[in-house]
Regions:
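Flexible "stalk/tail and boundary" regions
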Residues: 1-9, 13, 23-101, 108-183
Length: 183
């Protein structure tokens, strides 16, 4: 599952967040597929983890969170290296089931103590998970990122080639496609 997009939402007085409808459809379809395979009962389950660096919450689909946990189990790192991370991440992670209205419940602990979100939030798709930011913080972060790194909006194929932006320092050393001197 790939999550994309930016959605402005509100966390209600009962700490419920409505999952954006197109993402809800993806999560429901995945839960139904897993139910038909006998892997679950069809309930949409997500795992909510804090990201104190950004003051955001990360929302992981159940299957992806299980994959991440399995990767930790299979990590070549020693138990002494992995265990402190596990002792922090897993206790601070909350399991949440999506209700019939497409909402998940967020804990007071996450909202008030770990990331301090108010009711106006931005839900953003970040490839394999969602993030929930304060709306103002997300917009400020986006503006700052685009001002400092405009090359992030390059075509995905260009980004995958890891080529420097034609306007970036050092790019003049290398002929650019279409440049008559590149023959």
């Amino acid at each position: 599952m790939v999550f994309t997009g930016f959605y402005e939402h509100t966390i209600d007085a009962k700490n419920r967040l409505a999952i954006p409808s197109d993402i809800r459809k993806q999560l429901t379809a995945e839960a139904n597929r897993r139910a038909s395979d006998g892997d679950c009962d069809g309930t949409v389950v997500v795992y909510v983890t804090p990201d104190p660096k950004t003051n955001a919450l990360m929302i992981w689909p159940e299957a992806r969170f299980a994959e991440l946990a399995k990767m930790l189990d299979q990590s070549p790192r020693s138990l002494a290296e992995v265990l402190p991370f596990e002792r922090t991440m897993f206790p601070l992670t909350a399991r949440s089931e999506m209700d019939k209205q497409g909402r998940i419940r967020l804990s007071d602990f996450h909202l008030k103590q770990l990331v301090k979100l108010d009711s106006d939030v931005a839900v953003i798709g970040v490839n394999d998970h969602l993030e929930v930011w304060s709306r103002d913080a997300w917009m400020a972060n986006l503006t700052q990122t685009l001002e400092q790194s405009p090359h992030l909006l390059m075509h995905p194929r260009e980004a995958l080639r890891n080529e420097p932006d034609p306007g970036s320092p050092g790019s003049q050393d290398k002929p650019q496609p279409g440049d008559p001197t590149s023959n």
